[in-house]
């Protein structure tokens, strides 16, 4: 089995020998030709054209470090436009040849990535299973009798099978998450609007989101950051915002009454294990009422939002109804029974449900849900295409209605070896803040990536787009009085960690709010102190540092892993007679002790 392509491995190869890009292209072509699944791609860049693209890249940008995705092979779902290649949306009669790239493809090409081909999908992105295509049904890389998940079926399988380093799909109801779960990879669904959908065949235009599949959070987040950003071509495009989450998150999990797995005892047990894994990571796991979210989810295929799918292709459907997959046609044509009045009633119902769901969601930093409650064989899905497909969307359909960010990660394996995944779902624009938690969960699962369960670099890198990290130790920690100075300035939490062992912590006298003073004493053997690393835009960092009052200042703080980052330090002369709290291990422990809160071991 071919090993997965990762950004780190490709960068290392290219740094040693830039001409290796031609070898990588040859490897990609050989892997595609040797693939046992003929339904992954609908169309491919011709072999000679892909080899020529590698030569052109070497000629125009000979330094691999000059472009962020230099020489990285990727694929896109075939409802995303690529200039000069047909867009079919898995419907041959609908096919057209666009003159311009979709915005996301344009950005990937500018970053130096090499397109391998366009992947299969449930026709018109209507389905979560991957069988609704005249080009065949891609299969789970773990067992060819089982569905790959959809609608972004080929995109997920292409990554999991090691044919490309990453791929793009689209996600309206869960199409960028369910296939990730069924193939043991990562699926990143951004906050709606963060990534442009210009040049994408719409399913439900008001809900559609372009997603990224990758072997790891490190790779997926890197790609997402490159393709996101406001685009005037897309009326639903928004400027990405930066919102943080607490270092010790409160996580919503399904109550026992809401844990529906349709008789799949293995998946039920794996979800219980996932909840326990979250607790082992230090997360506070709290059950919540899923009812309003389930009611929102049902609107997508049982309410007037079906009419939005009709609006996307109605002239074509009217002209060539027999060109559609029978199941897809039946679903979309059923929208004709809804009236304009029904559409407004649906909006009113959605608003009421969103109010209920928001009241629940605001109690948590993020939710941890099964990505899909079970998996089915291809033949079973074809025999019962609507009911079984609906099962896959039980825990995914609501997310875009709620304008939330979601990351699907591997979480375990059933007794028969098929993968199970979970999805972390956070408020909109917490995309970057959510990623470290998803990476930590993925790593703790031990599932690796793809059919080979390969161990890959999991943690996302901190964005390097003019942002600066700052280590905070006291009143700026998550949940503390001055934390808003970070979040209001566009800051997001990178990680919660500890300092090296040679730091000491004191309570500064006469400060409001109360603040600690951190100093380094070489040779001191301490426990290391709890800190948080935050990322700030450069302009916010300057204002933030300028406002720091004496005796505090900034300098390099060495973390427990040996990395040094800019952080709060204190002038030592101000600590004469100050109370030392180093033994407590951190500022929060000191505050808890002052309030009479006891911790294990105390």
Locate predicted features.
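Serine-dependent amide/ester hydrolase catalytic core
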Residues: 9-15, 29-30, 120, 246, ...
């Amino acid at each position: 089995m071919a090993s997965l392509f990762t950004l780190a491995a490709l960068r290392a190869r290219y740094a040693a020998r830039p001409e290796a890009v031609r070898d990588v292209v040859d490897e990609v072509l050989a892997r595609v030709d040797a693939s046992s699944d003929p339904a992954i791609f609908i169309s491919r860049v011709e072999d000679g054209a892909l080899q020529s693209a590698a030569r052109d890249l070497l000629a125009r940008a000979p330094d691999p470090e000059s472009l962020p995705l230099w020489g990285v092979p990727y694929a896109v779902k075939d409802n995303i436009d690529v200039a000069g290649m047909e867009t079919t949306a898995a419907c041959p009669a609908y096919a057209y040849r666009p003159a311009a790239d979709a915005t996301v493809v344009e950005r990937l090409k500018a970053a130096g990535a090499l397109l391998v081909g366009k992947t299969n999908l449930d026709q018109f992105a209507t389905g979560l299973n991957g069988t609704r295509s005249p080009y065949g049904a891609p299969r789970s890389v773990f067992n060819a009798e089982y569905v790959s998940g959809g609608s972004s079926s080929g995109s997920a399988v292409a990554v999991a099978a090691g044919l490309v380093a990453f791929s793009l799909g689209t996600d309206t109801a869960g199409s960028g998450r369910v296939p990730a779960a069924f193939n043991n990879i990562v699926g990143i669904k951004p906050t709606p609007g963060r990534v442009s959908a210009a040049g994408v065949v719409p399913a439900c235009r008001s809900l559609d989101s372009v997603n990224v599949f990758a072997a790891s959070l490190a790779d997926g987040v890197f790609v997402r950051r490159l393709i996101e950003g406001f685009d005037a071509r897309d009326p639903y495009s928004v400027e990405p915002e930066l919102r943080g989450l607490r270092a010790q998150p409160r996580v919503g999990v399904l109550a026992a009454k809401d844990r529906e797995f349709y008789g799949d005892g293995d998946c039920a047990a794996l979800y219980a294990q996932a909840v326990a894994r979250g607790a082992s990571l230090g997360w506070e796991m709290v059950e919540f009422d899923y009812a309003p979210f389930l009611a929102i989810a049902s609107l997508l295929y049982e309410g007037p939002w079906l009419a939005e799918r009709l609006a996307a292709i109605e002239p074509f459907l009217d002209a060539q109804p027999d060109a559609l997959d029978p199941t897809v046609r039946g679903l979309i044509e059923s929208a004709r029974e809804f009236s304009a009045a029904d559409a407004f009633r649906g909006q009113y119902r959605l608003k009421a449900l969103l109010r209920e769901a928001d009241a629940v969601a605001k109690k948590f930093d993020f939710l941890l849900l099964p990505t899909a409650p079970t998996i089915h064989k291809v033949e079973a899905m074809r025999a019962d295409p609507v009911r079984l497909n609906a099962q896959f969307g039980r825990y995914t359909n609501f997310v875009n209605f709620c304008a939330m960010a979601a990351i699907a990660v591997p979480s375990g394996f059933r007794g028969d070896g098929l993968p199970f995944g979970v999805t972390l779902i956070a408020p909109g624009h917490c995309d970057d803040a959510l990623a470290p938690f998803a990476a930590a969960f993925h790593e703790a699962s031990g599932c690796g990536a793809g059919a080979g369960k390969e161990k890959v670099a999991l943690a996302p890198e901190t964005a390097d787009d003019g942002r600066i990290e700052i280590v905070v130790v006291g009143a700026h920690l998550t949940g503390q009085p001055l934390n808003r100075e970070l979040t209001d300035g566009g800051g997001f939490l990178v990680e919660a960690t500890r300092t090296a062992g040679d730091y000491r912590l004191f309570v500064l006298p006469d400060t409001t709010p109360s603040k600690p003073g951190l100093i380094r004493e070489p040779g001191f053997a301490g426990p290391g102190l709890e800190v948080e690393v935050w990322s700030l835009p450069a302009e916010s960092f300057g204002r933030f540092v300028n406002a720091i009052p004496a005796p505090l200042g900034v300098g390099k703080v060495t973390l427990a892993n040996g990395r040094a980052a800019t952080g709060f330090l204190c002038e030592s002369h101000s600590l004469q007679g100050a109370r030392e709290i180093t033994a407590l291990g951190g500022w929060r422990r000191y505050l808890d002790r002052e309030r009479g809160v006891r911790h294990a071991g105390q």
